[in-house]
Amino acid sequence: MIHIENLSKTYATPHGRFEALRGINLHIQQGEVFGIIGPSGAGKSTLVQCINLLERPDQGSIAIGGQALVGLGEAQLRNQRRRIGMVFQGFNLLARRTVYGNVALPLEIAGVARAEIPARVERLLALVGLEHLRDRYPSQISGGQKQRVGIARALANDPDVLLSDEATSALDPETTHNILALLRDINRKTGVTVVMITHQMEVVREICDRVAVLSHGEVVELGSTREVFAAPRHEVTRAMVSAATASDLSEATLAAVKQRIDALAAAEPGRAVRLWRLSLKGVAAGEPLWSDLAREFALDVSLVQARVEDIQGVAVGTLFVLAQGAPHAVKDALAALAAREITVEEIAHEPATDRSAYHVAA
């Protein structure tokens, strides 16, 4: 559906050239909900502006439904933009138009026959659950209701793609949940491809099928939402997942575990002591891992911290365990975990923000 190849965008600033996007490659499939996430300054907004060519990339190509956009003239581009609906963070509703009037506006601009507009607007208002507020003005409705108007307006021309640029970041958690449920429902009913631009990992967890993580203008991680939450690879992704799930060790806990490791190592110098982070998903998240490790490899295994989340119907778990045993047994246990497709990281003694870790299995 959306094919982005080698996309780059540079801006001139008083301090020199700034590379907002660098070599972006993304293939977004028809009908999926795709998340683009990253911290502030990662290039998310620039990317969404390039997708609908509000910003022209310096190099690279963008195609939607097989139609290349970069080389189009203004008239052709206007027609193609009607295939792309846009939902904004700030609603951008016209204060002097009613809910009905705001939804009707893009149809009027597109030159839809007057006789056709009422039925199309009523259908859209029913789709977003606002038919009872059709005659209200923006000042008379809530933030969540305003965003529903924005979604209906974005769908007015029956687009193939719906771009959501931080559409929930100004909303409270309950309203955010309701808006995301609405977007998912619209996606299922209409088949529209939804691209979610967000800095909120909670949004990705709730609605997105796949996610791309941006950092400093580059895609640093790409995968299904379940995979990214279960085993984030890049440090930016790890930090965002940890913040969203509280799945990392606190500084105080890590310091206490370090003291325990030192004490165990001093008490039994011939035995290896390791702190592991295990990332599991699906059936593996419910398996009795530490009892298996203790029985099969004669390891003493204690649970430091555990968290299991439901990510779109799949259990995704993060476990921190302290393992002690003969060095060869520890090595064999790591191999056994790898065979179960469990990601294992050995946590060094440094604080969590600076610690070194390595992937034993992915």
From Swiss-Prot:
Catalyzed reactions per annotation: L-methionine(out) + ATP + H2O = L-methionine(in) + ADP + phosphate + H(+); D-methionine(out) + ATP + H2O = D-methionine(in) + ADP + phosphate + H(+)
What are the GO cellular component annotations?
A: plasma membrane
Residues annotated as binding ATP: 38-45
This protein's UniProt keywords: Amino-acid transport, ATP-binding, Cell inner membrane, Cell membrane, Membrane, Nucleotide-binding, Translocase, Transport
Pfam families attached to this UniProt entry: ABC_tran, NIL
In which broad location class does this protein mainly occur, judging by the first location in its UniProt entry? membrane
**Which cell locations does it reside in?**
Cell inner membrane
Task: Kindly indicate whether the keyword Nucleotide-binding belongs to this entry.
Answer: yes
Enzyme class name:
translocase
The organism's place on the tree of life at top rank: Bacteria
Gene3D superfamilies assigned = 3.30.70.260, P-loop containing nucleotide triphosphate hydrolases
Membrane topology per record: Peripheral membrane protein
Q: In Gene Ontology terms, what is one molecular function of this protein? A: ATP binding
This entry's Enzyme Commission designation comes to 7.4.2.11
The signal peptide here is none
Q: Which residues form the ABC transporter domain?
A: 2-241
Family statement: Belongs to the ABC transporter superfamily. Methionine importer (TC 3.A.1.24) family.
Physiological role: Part of the ABC transporter complex MetNIQ involved in methionine import. Responsible for energy coupling to the transport system.
The record's note on quaternary structure and interaction partners says: The complex is composed of two ATP-binding proteins (MetN), two transmembrane proteins (MetI) and a solute-binding protein (MetQ).
Name under which the protein is recorded: Methionine import ATP-binding protein MetN
